[in-house]
From Swiss-Prot:
Function: Involved in the sporoblast-to-spore polar tube biogenesis. Plays a role in the control of the polar tube extrusion as part of a specific response to ionic stimuli.
This protein's name: Polar tube protein 3
Glycosylation (residues): 36, 44, 104, 130, 606, 1094
Record keyword Chaperone present: no
Gene Ontology BP, a term: sporulation resulting in formation of a cellular spore
Protein keywords: Glycoprotein, Signal, Sporulation
Quaternary structure and interacting proteins, as annotated: Interacts with PTP1 and PTP2.
Coiled coil: none
Length: 1256
């Protein structure tokens, strides 16, 4: 115990305990004096008692008067003279740290010791005489001073104690005195035997004498009184401290009396502290010391101004440290080990509390957690006492569950509190203030409109103010971004770590991609080299073989010529010799091939093996060996053996077997309800790539078979089929290729914590994302991990199909869009799957053959002999068709029919029976005799009739009629694929189909955004053709563009260039980029320009974003110099304007003229232009200089003519005088000397359809 208390004291002296477990135990050093909130500081009693072991005093031992104290002369400094034995002993204790030499004490210490020895009793006596303290206080304080004699006091019942002990349990019966003749006997009170001995009762009576608490105000009054009459500060503090110490001792005696008065503990349960006392009692910290220490900690924190919750928590930590220390002693650990282990647990508690306090902005959550845990621990301890030993593990388990439940509740409360404090409330306040500011701006604008005299000035000031606000907001945003960067003045740690981890992940991915690319290049290079080497080896081998043949021919030629002298005979002999040698070499090569085949026989003889054998026999054996021999090539062919084994293993695997089919979606269903489902993101697409290897062919075939098995079914176990899957409570629903979209009535999208930063870098909207901490609701994430959640209720998610194989990354509703490119899961609480009924989708995938022609073909081929053959073939066909029956939970039965070729079909039981009955040799329904009877006009002898004449045209016409009837024009093309000519009948069907498709997407709304969208949709066919995509794909793309983006583009077009940022940095530009289809000809700039053109058409405002200035001319005028500017617009027209240099208010847009390309006609509005219309195109800068922008923002590569020098004031000589340069919409204009030119004659009227503004 002494070692533990010394450790605590050392930590107090260092000031460590406050930073670890109980920093509250230390405050001021003895040389420091401070003041509390009440004007004084009594110091820390444990520190003071450790510094000055006991108050030194001078008291007459012979005196029996406990209230009379002799005054002794006090000498300050010099030697310390002991006055009695106790005084001498305490002086020795005090100078123990000074090498046992009193002279080593400083003057201050000597003075303090003498004042403590003489002043305390004198001061106490003075306070008692002047009535500052009562007799019981003087008795309590005087009894604590060494040598002091306390007089007997009257025994009183114990009263209220500040130790928070139960009032009823604290009342002890003191009316009946104990029997002192039998100390160990049972104490009897009023005839009732108690559980205490007479000795224990006597101790209780002594402890409860005069235990009324002393008011804390008495110590302060005594402190002030002593200072006011001239006592020194150490004396005043010592007396005040003694009064407070006396109060603590009173409370501890009351606690001791209460502990003794309690009944015996149940013998089956021994408290941990009692067990520790029994095993190692000398080191155990007593309950009294524990309570006193906790109270001191609590008071110290209250004195420092800490809240009550914090003080309670720190006091509890101190008690927890002592409890853990005692418990570790009980487990057999040494005092040092027990202390270290206890401190480690306290450290963990502090780390947890520090994290909670840092998050919550204070210690309230930590204090609440501590209070919850203390209450649970207390309840569990009470249950443990009453529970037999065999059932106590259940109590412990119940306690842990309760603690975990409380922790979870606190975490959820904390998450909600933080979300409200740091997200919801700031955003609401900001939006409220923005609304107020907007209202004030509107009011200022109305003032300008209502007062024509100062209208221009007020509106100019309002516009300037808005521009300044925008610039200031942009500057603030840039400053915040700079501060959040690791190199800025301030770094957000969370963003910093997220950025570092994201950059590291991207770096790792790029590195892996580079490595894979290098490996692929290396493999391709090796393959090319191997192929080149192989070709070179075969070429050299054949060259060597030809050399052998040539040498044989030369040898024979020489011999025959030498023997006969006949050149023709020698030449003939040479040809025969060469032919014989070539045949010999061929036989040898065949023999080598047979040898190699025998060696590689177990591998089989696929194409690659045959090729290798041919190569080996040609180039690596026989007389014409080139490169490696057969032995050196064994390793290469071992790899081929392994490759072949891999293929065989793949072939042996079955696609999917023993599937637990729980439900089948009927083939006629177009809408499927979904509840409590979830889909993994991103969505899977469809690939039409051809397999490049044999393994890829096998895997693709297996996946196709697996899709056929699980499509439109709810499966009990997860199966990888390449289809998108909705995971529900009762199984996994595999979405077919016929699906169109998912409509989410109520649902959420979940993102990883790093997604928001990536989306913000990509300029994507993240306003719907809300940060959460996983408290167990996301099974796939660890507890405590952060993630983002977005409400997807009311959104629609388009699904990929074979016609649109690339999955979209955007969900939309009528107003907003939500990018899900970085999400990992979509949760659907209530939704609907919209799809084309599978029975109709199959018809599109496998068009029906014209029934009439099939019927005629069958009748023409009918005969008795062929009928028998047909029956046999029919049986074989039926054997090749597999069927599987499924029963839904509602009892309905469906049959899946899978033929060797084609797409499996699901049909009802009756439909399946009828269909299989009619299966013939060609898998087309055989014609029954009844059918033959009903069509007698069809002759059986096709050879002697002309009924087949014109059948081709009839067949085509019938097919087109059927297509037109069902409205499926997407399967047709207008042009004949063979001659490139447009087929009128097909074109009409396709046009009708596209027209219906467009009408389905038109909106009945009259808002500007809806009108702009309808304008785009009405031209969908031509736009889609220019982008190289289908009309359906184009319409799907436009339907994903939210109204908010169109509204933003309208505002952007109306804003002056100086007040708007670059197009590529806007939200709408990134939104358009996210919805683009997978097309080589579609780019963000062209689509953006197309939308701005339609905005211009609908709003009758010029397109100020994509215009391109073609030329500028400066011409003289009678009054001033006017500048004529010709500007090409994205609509295919040219806009001409006249302006006065350096006077922006004097600009006249004359009109638009046709330029190269097809113009977009602007309809005449028939109304006056609005006051807020742009005065001139955004990039028209008056003055003789060409505008500095010089670039189309939507076409970065297009530049203006490099004419940046000053323009001469001389008339332009490009156009003859008096001749019109262009024919405009309704009027003409010529430069110069045109009597109708601006400034010379009457002011011209705006052109028909003109939508700009004229300003003079």
């Amino acid at each position: 115990m002494l070692l533990f208390l010394l450790c605590l004291y050392s930590m107090v002296a260092r000031g460590d305990l406050g930073s670890r477990s109980s920093s509250h135990a230390v405050h001021h050093h003895h040389s420091k004096e401070g003041k509390n909130a009440s004007g004084m500081d009594y110091g820390n009693r444990s520190t003071r008692n450790a510094r000055v072991k006991v108050r030194l005093h001078n008291h007459n031992d012979d005196s029996q008067d406990g209230h009379h104290h002799h005054k002794v002369h006090r000498s300050h400094g010099g030697s310390i003279k002991p006055h009695n034995q106790k005084h001498a002993k305490l002086i020795r204790n005090m100078i123990g740290t000074h090498e046992n030499d009193p002279e080593n004490l400083t003057h201050e210490e000597k003075d303090l010791a003498n004042m403590a020895a003489h002043g305390n009793l004198d001061a106490l006596d003075m306070l008692y005489r002047n009535g500052s303290i009562t007799p019981d206080v003087a008795e309590s304080v005087g009894g604590s001073i060494p040598g002091g004699i306390t007089e007997p006091v009257v025994i009183q019942p114990a009263e209220s104690s500040p130790m928070e002990v139960n009032e009823e349990a604290r009342v002890v019966d003191t009316m009946s005195p104990p029997d002192y003749s039998d100390p160990t006997g049972v104490y009897v009170s009023n005839g009732v035997a108690t559980g205490r001995t007479n000795e224990e009762q006597a101790e209780i009576n002594v402890l409860n004498r005069n235990e009324n608490p002393i008011d804390d105000g008495i110590a302060e009054e005594a402190y002030s009184s002593l200072l006011s009459v001239g006592h020194s500060l150490p004396v005043a503090k010592a007396v005040a401290d003694e009064i407070k110490d006396a109060n603590v001792r009173k409370m501890l005696r009351t606690k001791r009396a209460y502990d003794i008065s309690q009944p015996p503990v149940n013998p089956v349960y021994i408290p941990q502290a009692e067990l520790a006392r029994a095993t190692n009692s000398k080191d155990v910290v007593s309950d009294t010391d524990r309570q006193m220490f906790m109270k001191k900690v609590f008071e110290e924190y209250i004195r420092q101004g800490a809240p009550v919750e914090r003080a309670n928590f720190e006091a509890g930590q101190a008690g927890f440290l002592i409890d853990e220390y005692n418990e570790n002693l009980a487990s057999g650990l040494s005092p040092d080990a027990a202390y270290e282990k206890a401190m480690s647990l306290v450290d963990l508690n502090y780390q947890h509390a520090t994290r909670a306090a840092a998050i919550a902005g204070g210690g309230q959550v930590a204090a609440q957690n501590a209070a919850d845990r203390s209450l649970i621990e207390e309840t569990s301890a009470n249950e443990m006492v009453k529970t037999p030993s065999g059932l106590r593990p259940e109590v412990l388990k119940k306690k842990e569950e309760a603690i975990n439940s409380k922790k979870l509740d606190r975490a959820q409360d904390l998450s909600s509190y933080l979300t409200k404090l740091h997200i919801v409330e700031p955003v609401n306040r900001a939006h409220q203030k923005l609304s107020q500011a907007a209202a004030l701006k509107d009011a200022a604008s109305m003032e300008g409109l209502d007062n024509p005299v100062v209208q221009e000035k007020i509106l100019t000031d309002v516009a300037a103010s808005s521009a300044e606000d925008l610039a200031k907001a942009h500057e603030n945003l840039e400053n915040v971004k700079t501060q959040l960067k690791p190199g800025g003045r301030k770094t957000n740690a969370l963003n910093f770590l997220s950025k570092v981890l994201t950059e590291k992940a991207i770096k790792d991915v790029n590195q892996r991609n580079e490595e894979m690319q290098k490996e692929a290049v290396k493999a391709q290079k090796e393959a090319n080299e191997n192929s080149a080497v192989k070709s070179a080896e075969e070429h050299l081998a054949k060259a060597a073989e030809q050399q052998i043949i040539n040498n044989e021919g030369k040898s024979v030629f020489s011999k025959v010529l030498e023997s006969t002298g006949d050149i023709s005979e020698a030449a003939k002999a040479r040809e025969e010799a060469e032919r014989a040698m070539a045949e010999t070499l061929r036989h040898q090569r065949e023999a080598r091939k047979a040898e190699v085949m025998k060696m590689l026989g177990p591998m089989g003889m696929n194409s690659s093996v045959k090729e290798a054998v041919e190569h080996m026999a040609t180039a690596h054996a026989g007389l014409n060996v080139v490169g490696s021999d057969l032995n050196e090539l064994n390793k290469k062919y071992e790899e081929e053996v392994a490759h072949q084994s891999n293929i065989e293993e793949l072939l042996r695997e079955t696609a999917t077997s023993n599937l637990e089919v729980k439900e089948v979606i009927p083939p006629t269903t177009s809408r499927v309800g979904i509840s409590e489902g979830k889909i993994k993101l991103p969505l899977k697409g469809f690939s039409n790539e051809e397999p490049k290897t044999e393994e890829e062919t096998i895997v693709q075939s297996r996946q196709r078979n697996r899709r056929n098995q699980v499509r439109n079914k709810v499966i009990g176990t997860p199966v990888e089929s390449g289809l998108n899957v909705v995971e529900m409570e009762d199984g996994y629903m595999h979405i077919s290729e016929a699906a169109k979209a998912l409509k989410i009535n109520k649902g959420k999208v979940f993102y990883p914590e790093s997604a928001k930063g990536i989306m913000e870098k990509q300029k994507l909207d993240t306003s719907l994302l809300e940060h959460k901490f996983n408290t167990g609701e996301r099974a796939g994430l660890d507890k405590g991990v952060g993630y983002y959640e977005a409400d997807a209720s009311g959104f629609t998610l388009p699904l990929p199909s074979p016609l649109n194989p690339v999955p979209t990354s955007t969900m939309t509703n009528e107003e907003k869009s939500l990018n899900i490119g970085h999400a990992f899961e979509l949760e659907i609480e209530d939704g609907e799957l919209i799809q084309t009924p599978w029975i109709e989708f199959v018809k599109d995938m496998r068009p029906m053959v014209n029934g009439r022609m099939a019927h005629e073909a069958e009748v023409a081929a009918a005969s008795e002999m062929k009928s028998r053959v047909e029956e046999e073939k029919k049986a074989k066909n039926l054997e090749g068709i597999t069927t599987e029956v499924y029963t839904n939970p509602d009892g309905s039965k469906f049959v899946e029919v899978s033929s060797p070729y084609g797409v499996p079909e699901i049909m009802t039981m009756d439909q399946a029976v009828e269909s299989l009955k009619s299966v013939g040799s060609s898998s087309v329904g055989a014609v029954s005799e009844e059918a033959k009877k009903q069509t007698p006009e069809v002759p059986l002898d096709m050879a002697v009739t002309n009924s087949v004449k014109g059948s081709e045209e009839s067949f085509v016409s019938s097919v087109l009629s059927t297509i037109q009837k069902i409205g499926n024009g997407k399967a047709l093309a207008k042009r004949n694929a063979f001659n490139g000519k447009v087929d009128g009948e097909k074109a009409a069907i396709v046009d009708e189909y596209n027209k219906e498709l467009i009408n389905e997407h038109l909106s009945p709304s009259s808002t500007v955004e809806a009108r702009v969208r309808n304008s785009i949709i009405s031209k969908a066919e031509s736009y889609a053709r220019s982008m190289g995509i289908s009309t359906q794909s184009f319409l799907n793309m436009i339907s994903q563009l939210p109204d908010s983006s169109i509204k933003e583009m309208i505002s952007y077009n109306e804003a002056p260039p100086s007040a708007r940022k670059d197009v590529a940095e806007t939200h709408f530009y990134n939104q358009i980029a996210s919805i683009l289809p997978d097309s080589k000809t579609a780019n963000t700039g062209s689509v953006t320009e197309m939308i701005f053109n339609n905005i211009s058409t609908v709003t009758h405002e010029p397109n100020t974003v994509g215009g391109e200035i073609l030329e500028q001319m400066t011409v003289p005028n009678l009054k001033t110099i006017e500048q004529v500017e010709t500007k090409k617009t994205p609509t295919g027209t040219t806009q001409v304007s006249v302006s006065v240099p350096n006077d922006p208010g004097k600009i006249q847009v004359l009109g638009e003229v046709k330029f190269k390309g097809n113009p977009t006609t602007t309809p005449s509005s028939g109304r006056r232009p609005a006051s807020n219309q742009a005065v001139a195109p955004a990039n028209v800068v008056p003055g003789p200089m060409v505008p500095s922008s010089g670039r189309n923002p939507l076409k970065p590569g297009a530049r203006l003519p490099a004419n940046n020098g000053p323009v001469s004031n001389a008339p332009a000589a490009r156009i003859p005088a008096g001749q019109p340069d262009h024919t405009m919409r309704g009027f003409s204009h010529s430069f110069p000397n045109n009597p109708q030119a601006p400034g010379i004659g009457a002011t011209p009227s705006p052109a028909v359809g003109y939508s700009g503004k004229i300003a003079r």
